[in-house]
Amino acid sequence: MNKKEDQTCVRIWKIGVLSLLLVLLFALTGCGKEAPEDYVKERLEKLQAGDDEMAEMLLQAGIESVDGKYVAAFPENLKNRYREFLKKACGHFTYTVKEAEAYNSDYRVKVEIAPAKVGDAVEALDAEYVQTLESTELTEAVEILLSKAEEQLETCDNGRKKELTLEIREKGSSYELTKDSQKELAEHLLSGYMDPYQAVAEVLDIRDYLQSVLDATYKGEVSKYARHTGSTEEQAREKYEKSFSGEELAAMDLSTEQEKRFQEAMKKIFAGSRYEIGAMQKTADGGYVTQVTVTPNLSLQKSSQELHTNAKSGKYGSEAQLVEGYLTTLETYAQQPVYGEATTVELHLSTGAILMSGDAMQEVNRLMEQILPS
């Protein structure tokens, strides 16, 4: 082989090597990154298998949707359990990934999502559960319901399909969904998934309101009552103070010092009231029922009886002595209250009892008459 032929062979060898390198480079770069559609499909499969990030996103959106409906905030110690429930619920949405198209330097992928109708699947269970609710603690009550609700997820139907356009961008050798697309996707995976929480929270919110009414009336603890009624604590405090300076006090024509003695004695007597609200249930007609254990505070009743007996016997020679005798009697029972036998009162509250009006208020008044009979 002459020199010219040798140079030709070298050139052919170099071209061959270069071609091989180009083929290998093309194989490594062109086949190493999956198609945008495949990435979206894998992402959706991961969501169906239970994805922590999506469960957190769903939970936060759910908490925001119920924020302000109830006085109690969503409990921190319930979040982990609710995320697990959401991960299982995500196994029941369906999808179809369609075509992808380039969009600027990113991609758009069309996807049809049929959400899992969680609310429908657990609706009957929710209703039955709150009719027999035994717990008075929000986290415990919801956790029990979630365990039952997970069994119902197998009956979950799918809602109407919705076509979404998801935007994805390149990230290293793969892709990632944009934040907006993640949020849009989260909004369409499940429906009614906060229903178990709301079913329980609604009932316990009514119970909590009843507790706040009693505590504000008898104990002077007004902060929770103010939150339930939308008033300020100052307004609630003023209402409490006025309850001890009504027509009865004005009719007695007391001095400033005597008024103070009367109000202090009455506040102590009221504060000594004993009541305990049991579990609350929701009735089939949409009302609420609970059992309240009451140990009647007989102090006012005994004070009136003692005053009447003393007056009838001629113990008081003047109106001033009568007033002083009454104040002294109240102060005695304020320091040493007298109680009757404990009893259980069944209390029925109508729908909308959160405003405590009409029949609902009559029920509460009946309860109050047994807590502190006059």
Task: Go through the PLM ranges and name each one.
Residues A27-G30:
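C-terminal motif of bacterial Sec signal peptides marking the signal peptidase cleavage site
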Residues K3-V17:
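Bacterial N-terminal signal peptides that target proteins for export
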